[in-house]
Each structure stands twice: as C-alpha cells, then as structure tokens.
Regions:
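A terminal-accessory region detector
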Residues: 109-165
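Structured, non-transmembrane catalytic/binding cores
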Residues: 11-15, 21, 55-63, 123
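Basic, alpha-helical interaction scaffolds
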Residues: 31-104
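Short coil/turn segments at secondary-structure boundaries
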Residues: 7-9, 82-86, 99-107, 131-137, ...
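Short, conserved micro-motifs composed of acidic
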Residues: 3-39
Length: 165
C-alpha cells in the first residue's frame, strides 16, 4: 500500500531540548524536502516549536473575538443580556476552549484565556471594572474558562486513566 505524502501540507516541527537547533531537511521517497516550521496545525490545535510541548492560543483567541463580535453584530444590545450570554456560551466559548483540556497550559495561558472571556462581559455590560464583571459572573453562575478547563482536564485524565496533575 503506497501512501503519498502531500509535501505542500506536511511540515516538520521539533519539540524538546534541541528545539532551536537547525535540522537537515527530511526528504520523502519521491525526493521532495519537507519544510521545518515554528508552528503547525494538527486537529485544530496550533503546536509551537518549544523546549516543552506547547500550543499557541493566538489563533483560537482571534477566532473567539471574531465569534463574540459576530454575536454583538447580529443582536447588538437589542436582545436581553441573558440571550446574549446564552449565545456567547454556545457559540463563542467552545471556539476558545476547543481541545484545551488535553493540553497542559501555563498560568499565563490560563490568565490570557480568562482575560478574553472577561473582556466580553466588560463590553456587554459597558464597564471596565473587573469587580463588577466578577459579581455579575458569580450572580449568573458563570465560571471562568480556567476553572472550566481545570474540571475538564480532571475528567479527561480520569477517562483515559492518566494521573491528575
């Protein structure tokens, strides 16, 4: 069975202690050299060249902001806050949290995700006061993405027999 590799869509990436070392090109059986990349997309997750396994949150956050602005663009401030939050939870949050329970995120990554989440509420309720946003989220029973990801990670690890972090 011959499996042809599409060299235009195939990239090489190095993770580990020698991630920054320049490598020789890998050549396919057809004689086509595969490109080395600093970032690649695999199953919708952007993996970054690093000393440890690391993912990039730039594109998911960009997609999240696009989805959130789309919700505001469609319903604006015409719909009630409850409707907008329901749309936000069903259309925007999954874009931000896709597959992150399977990745180990740094504290700065989690803070970055929480910041994007909180900015939506600041825009919705027309405030820049984070305490007001936290009170609203608490009153509505809305958890920050870092908390949701913590719970999802535990479920993921238990379902696959992995040890808790």
């Amino acid at each position: 069975m011959d499996m042809v590799i599409n060299a235009k869509k195939t990239f090489c990436l190095r993770v580990g202690r020698r991630a920054s070392v320049i490598c020789a090109n890998i050549v396919t059986l057809n004689g086509i050299a595969l490109q080395w990349s600093d970032e690649l997309r695999y199953l919708g997750v952007y993996i970054v060249r690093s000393f440890r396994f690391k993912i990039s949150l730039d594109k998911p956050k960009r997609s999240f902001y696009r989805a959130a602005n789309s919700v505001f663009g469609k319903v604006g401030h015409v719909a009630s806050e409850e409707v907008i939050i329901q749309l936000f939870n069903s259309k925007c949050v999954p874009v931000l949290l896709y597959a992150l329970e399977a990745c180990s995120l740094s504290k700065s990554d989690l803070c970055s995700i929480d910041f994007a989440f909180n900015r939506f509420f600041m825009k919705l309720f027309r405030t820049n006061n984070i305490e007001i946003v936290k009170n609203i989220q608490s009153y509505l029973g809305i958890s920050l993405p870092s908390v949701v990801l913590g719970n999802r990670s535990v479920k993921f690890e238990l379902s696959f027999g992995l040890f808790a972090r």
